[in-house]
Amino acid sequence: MTNEWGEVWYYKYDALGRRIEKACPQRNTKTTYLWDGDQVAYQETEKHGKTESLRHCIFNGWELIAQQDSYFKTDLRNHHKTWTQTTNYAVCQPNGQPLALFNPQGKRTWRKAPSSLWGLPLLENWESKQAEPLNPNLLFAGQYFDQESGLAYNRFRYYDPQSGCYLKSDPIGLAGGETPYAYVHNPMGWIDPFGLARCGNLKKNKMGCLQGIKDYLIGI
């Protein structure tokens, strides 16, 4: 993928359609993902071949519960970098989108940028104003937002929050509905974790969403 700044990004996937790596030669950066079933449990980002940050995420179904980060933090007094480790707990919307992170002492360490109904960030450079690099990069349930493209990886398709639609049509064509590029009709309460079939609520477990996909494919 080539973005508007001329950067070329490469993405790798496993046999189950799970993205396991993304890299950009111009930035000399690479991020590797390890999955626990249908969720990214661990990610490591390298820059110039050296580890820059680590992240371990814990989910309850499709909802982020906790996030452990390790990264180099620069001391503004002497500009020395030290390896920092933090644990934060997430508060999420009904659609799975994280609103804020809090440390064990209850202090807010990160909060979501204002966004449109369909997830489009409304303020530029929001993350650069955050005290710590803790952005979960999660959009709605099952979606991982890519800053380099402005798109969200949604397992089997990519979602565009600017248009509120997928970039690829429904794999089963018009059998899936009159609008094969559409996301869910109400993104505040409905989700589509796999990019294949919508689920009525966040609390529905993974098996419930998988059953929804099965019913969807056979036309129930």
Please annotate each region the language model reported.
Residues 22, 120-124, 157-167, 171, ...:
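Short, low-complexity export/processing leader segments characterized by acidic and small residues
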Residues 199-220:
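Catalytic toxin/effector domains delivered as secreted proteins or via bacterial secretion systems
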